[in-house]
UniProtKB/Swiss-Prot annotation:
Function according to Swiss-Prot or TrEMBL: Has a role in sister chromatid separation.
Main location: cytoplasm
Keyword list, A-Z: Cytoplasm, Cytoskeleton, Microtubule, Phosphoprotein
Record organism: Schizosaccharomyces pombe (strain 972 / ATCC 24843) (Fission yeast)
Gene designation: dis1
Bias (Low complexity) ranges: 579-601, 609-640
List of residues that carry Phosphoserine: 293, 300, 551, 556, 590, 649
Recorded superkingdom: Eukaryota
UniProt-recorded name of the protein: Phosphoprotein p93
Length: 882
């Protein structure tokens, strides 16, 4: 009796409106099922006979109640054996997959997973698989993802010997066609697991139904998968020691594979958790006869190029190829382009004109079908990597079409386009394609601007050559405009580009190119630049320095060298020569200089003097004669001609002073000369006039530098003024627009008022005409009513007067007055009666009046009391007079 009462109480409580009552009912049921030994217990009987009762708890809206219901079902299936499973399998699978498996609570998901495993092991696998394949195709992403995870778990636990792969072959292409990235990610995991069981049969059945990029990503993932065989009742679940990178087709986020390292006596293996459910670890067995097929990389770089044979790609451009490209069916166009992929993937091409092929690709990049665009981007990637620098003449053909497709929102297509753009950058460099890139920063589509800025930022970080000055000015001016764009991704991408430029050129150099930048945004740019690493720097020499060349003002170079005398083993043996050397040294080391000479110029002059007149070392084989060199300079016609030329260039050509200075500066050079088998050293000297000329040139250079600094400040001031004027112009335009809007609004109001005025004037004229007609009619009626006949009326009045006298004598005065009134108002003829009837039966109007009020006194009273304005009455009187 107590158990019967318990069952009846539970069955009544699970349908209660209060969630607490339902929670307590399932909690009590769970305790009772845990205490029971098998399905012979009485608490199992209601649920075996009526398994539809489980739907109430599995679909409960309260999460704790649902959790206890799922746990009770798991315990029921575990202890009721085959009898309970057979009764409940057709009722509980659908609620478990729809409500419990996608639940946000982990305990509910685990209990649901365990319940489904029990059903699958108890000869109810067909029900479970049928429900899972149906739930994996639903539109609800969470339910579909949970079902795919459960399928993956069942495939790992039972394997292909127990599960048929054919339903999986039909399901996987459908999953890859879904728009949700999580569904496609789980489809990739399921494909990896299925490939481990069936091998190349997966490619045969599934790859023809997938996109090319999906096939490539799956093949890259299949590299690390090993076969799975059943050994001793254990399911193998092993991967190579390399990490599995799962593909992502429509998400910018990179998925993180759930990999855990495990050490064992047999070696280190990586076990991948394909679902969020807890599954026991199983023993890993190595494959016996299985070899995964090598993956085909889409943009893999060419290897062994030196030994590769050039491929004739242009021979594939047959008339059939062009016919297929012009087909209205997108599949024909896609197949035509795919036929070129194996040929174009070769690393070396034969020499030829590839403009026709690239025009075909550029046209395909504009195709309406995104699949065709993806294949065209793949072809462009292969061609750019194969041609390398030879691709430079064709950049103008494909770059506009390539950048214009950045407007696509499908991330997989954008990734393919970015791969092609990266291949072009690696082949041609950034500076050669900078002009085409900057044009698309002015595009009207914000998505195009965003992706172009992001790609440009990556190129600036990777390139080792600084952009030229003209491109830098254009880029900075565009960035100053785009950083105030209304689209947030454009602003963020522009900020990153400016941060990269700051890291390359430094803030002081870049500040003169971003004059109009908002000062509030500069700190963020500087903060971002600290975390950016670049390879290009402006002070980094891009090419080795060439030796100095003579000035173009001279027809032939002049060597300021003195032929030395015979070498002397003891330079100080000749006292006259030594004294002359000291005198020359004192004369040349302390020349008379202007007061404006800088310290740097003095040090350079001293260095020249000391380098030209110092005594030779002991290892020298000859010594120069200072006296002879001092005397030889004035007598040399070439030197005098050179000085005259330099003075003329200083006076007449101020812009070429640096060239003159380079012509006048002659550094010491050692020139080996063979004369009788001996080498002699030539020393280059400089005269006082040359030193003075050099100081003048340096002063001119300093003055020019000061002028350039002033010009830069003036330029910056003008830029700021231009910016202020532009802001004022924009404000004035806005004010003018507001005023024009106000004026147009007032004009509309005036027009409406004029129309209302015309309508009221017309109505007033109509009212006046109606009043005039009514007034004339009333006057005629009044004249007829007041008209009394000369005969008949007097007789009646006399008769009435007699009767009145008689009645007055009898004292009935009231009747007399009444009789008089009735006589006075009685019509005298038929015409009078008709006039009165017409006056009384006429249609009343707003201004109609009774006929007895048309006497002068009644008219005045009516005019004062009636609701008619005095102005209207005056108008009526004037119209009557007229």
């Amino acid at each position: 009796m107590e158990l019967d009462d318990f069952n009846s109480r539970i069955l009544s409580q699970i349908f209660d409106k209060s969630w607490k009552v339902r929670f307590e009912a399932y909690e009590s049921l769970l305790h009772a099922l845990n205490r029971a030994l098998d399905d012979s217990d009485v608490c199992f009987q209601p649920w075996i006979h009526d398994p539809a009762l489980w739907k109430q708890g599995l679909c409960d809206s309260n999460v704790p109640t649902q959790e206890h219901a799922v746990k009770s079902l798991r315990c029921f299936l575990d202890k009721s054996r085959q009898k309970g499973v057979n009764s409940a399998k057709s009722f509980v699978v659908a609620p478990l997959l729809e409500k419990c498996l996608p639940s946000p609570r982990q305990s509910i998901r685990d209990a649901s997973h365990q319940a489904l495993l029990i059903l699958a092991k108890s000869d109810a696998l067909d029900y479970v698989l049928e429900g899972l394949f149906s739930a994996a195709r639903v539109k609800h992403p969470k339910q579909a993802v949970a079902s795919i995870k459960e399928l993956n778990s069942l495939l790992e636990n039972f394997g292909i010997p127990a599960l048929s792969p054919i339903p999986f072959y039909k399901l996987i292409p459908t999953l890859f066609a879904q728009s949700d990235k999580n569904i496609r990610q789980e489809a990739s995991n399921l494909s990896i697991t299925l490939y481990a069981w069936v091998g190349n049969a997966f490619k045969t059945h599934v790859f023809p139904q997938l996109k090319q990029i999906q096939v490539s990503d799956l093949e890259a993932s299949f590299q690390n998968v090993t076969s799975r065989t059943t050994t001793g009742g254990h399911i193998s679940n092993s991967l190579n020691t390399q990490e599995v990178v799962l593909p992502s087709f429509s998400s910018n986020a990179k998925p993180k594979p759930h990999l855990s390292s495990k050490s064992s006596s047999q070696g280190n293996t990586l076990q991948r958790s394909t679902s969020s459910f807890s599954t026991p670890n199983r023993k890993v067995s190595q494959p016996s006869d299985f070899s995964a097929s090598p993956s085909r990389s889409i943009v893999s770089p060419a290897k062994n190029i030196v030994g590769s044979t050039p491929v004739d790609v242009l021979s594939k451009l047959t008339p059939e190829f062009h016919t297929a490209l012009s087909s209205p069916k997108w599949k024909d166009r896609k197949e035509a382009l795919e036929s070129m992929v194996p040929v174009c993937s070769n690393p070396v091409y034969q020499e030829g004109d590839y403009s026709e092929l690239l025009r075909v690709i550029a046209k395909s990049l504009k195709d309406a079908n995104v699949v065709v665009v993806g294949v065209a981007a793949l072809l462009l990637t292969h061609i750019a990597k194969a041609l390398r620098k030879g691709f430079l003449p064709y950049t103008g053909i494909v770059l506009p079409s390539l950048f214009d497709r950045f407007k696509e929102r499908k991330s997989s297509l954008v990734h393919s386009l970015l791969d092609a753009a990266n291949a072009i950058f690696e082949s041609c460099g950034l500076n050669d394609i900078m002009d085409e890139t900057l044009e698309f920063l002015k595009h009207k589509n914000p998505q195009v601007k965003t992706e172009t800025l992001r790609w440009l930022n990556r190129c600036l970080q990777l390139t080792d050559v600084c952009p030229p000055r003209a491109s830098l000015e254009t880029l900075c001016s565009l960035c100053v405009t785009l950083i105030n764009d209304t689209f947030e991704p454009v602003r963020m991408a522009t900020t990153n580009v400016l941060a990269t430029l700051v890291q390359i050129f430094s803030q002081p150099v870049l500040s003169k190119y971003i004059v109009g930048l908002d000062p509030k945004k500069l700190p963020k740019i500087l903060e971002l630049s600290k975390d950016i690493t670049v390879n290009a720097h402006p002070n980094q020499p891009s090419r080795p320095r060439l030796p100095r060349v003579a000035s173009p003002l001279k027809t032939s170079p002049v060597k300021l060298a003195v032929t030395p005398q015979a070498p002397s083993p003891l330079p100080s043996s000749n006292p006259s020569q030594a004294s002359l050397t000291e005198e020359s040294l004192s004369t040349r080391s302390s020349p008379t200089k202007p007061s404006t000479t800088s310290l740097r110029s003095q040090s350079l002059v001293n260095r020249f003097a000391s380098s030209t007149l110092k005594a030779p070392s002991s290892s020298s084989k000859g010594v120069s004669n200072a006296a002879s060199s001092k005397q030889s300079f004035p007598s040399s016609p070439s030197i005098s001609k050179k000085l005259e030329t330099s003075r003329l260039s200083t006076k007449k050509l101020p812009g070429s002073t640096m060239k003159a200075a380079s012509a006048l500066k002659e550094y010491p050079q050692q020139q080996s000369m063979k004369s009788g088998g001996e080498k002699q050293d030539n020393l280059v000297t400089i005269t006082m006039s040359e030193k003075v000329e050099l100081d003048l040139l340096r002063e001119e250079k300093a003055i020019r530098q000061v002028q350039e600094a002033e010009d830069a400040l003036e330029r910056e001031r003008l830029f700021r003024e231009i910016n202020d004027l532009q802001i004022q112009n924009a404000e004035m335009k806005e004010q003018v627009y507001e005023k024009e809007s106000t004026i147009s609004q007032k004009e509309v109001e005036i027009t409406s008022l004029r129309n209302e005025k015309d309508r009221l004037s017309t109505r007033l004229q109509q009212v006046l005409l109606e009043l005039e007609k009514q007034h004339e009619t009333n006057e005629e009626a009044m004249d007829i009513d007041l008209k009394v006949p000369e005969s008949g009326a007097i007789g009646r009045v006399t008769t009435r007067a007699t009767a009145t006298t008689a009645m007055d004598e009898s004292g009935n005065a009231g009747m007399v007055s009444s009789g008089i009134h009735s006589v006075s108002t009685k019509p005298s003829s038929y015409g009078t009666r008709r006039s009165l009837a017409g006056s009384m039966l006429q249609k009343p109007t707003q201004f109609s009046r009774p006929s007895f009020m048309f006497s002068p006194e009644a008219r005045d009273n009516w005019r004062e009391s009636h609701d008619l304005s005095s102005h209207l009455w005056e108008q009526i009187q004037r119209m009557k007079k007229a």
